[in-house]
Amino acid sequence: MSGNTSENILGTFDGSSWYWHNKRNISISPAQLAIIFAVLGLVSLLIGSVFYWYGASLILPFSVLEIAALLIAFVYNAIHANDYEKLTLTSDAVHIERKIGLTLQQVQLMRSMTRVDKTSLQNQLIELRQGHQLAYFGQFIHVNLRLALAKQISARMISPVI
C-alpha cells in the first residue's frame, strides 16, 4: 500500500468525484535497484574473470548466466513497479482502472445499480457487483484494511457527490 493509509481508505474528493488510487508498495526506486543489480553483476563478472584467469574456465559462463538471471529479475520488477488500481466514483458511474504489468483493464459500472459486497471479504478482494457483472478492487490494500475500505466505498456510493 502506498501513501497515506487514511487517504487510501477514506478516498480523495477532487470537487466532482471521489477516487481511491492505490499503488504497489515499493521501498526502492528503479534507479537504485538498477545500481544494485549493476554492482552485483559486475562483482559476479569480476569473480568469474578471476577464476577464468587462474584456469577455472567454467566459472565465467555461470557468472554470465547469473547476470542474465539478474537482468530478467530487473526487467520483471521494472514492468510491475508502476502497478496501480484506481476507483473513481462520479455522480452516475463507478470507474475501475487497473494496471498490472503491461495490461490495463478498465471497467465502468452504473453507480445506481452497483453494490459493494462487504460480507465475504476474508482474505479476498472487494467485490463490486452490477447484476452479473463483477469488478474487484483492493489488491494493493492490506487484507486487514479491506473491510474498512469496502465500507467507505459503499458509504460514498450511497451519499450524493457534491
Labelled PLM ranges:
Residues 63-90:
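Helix-adjacent hinge/juxtasegments
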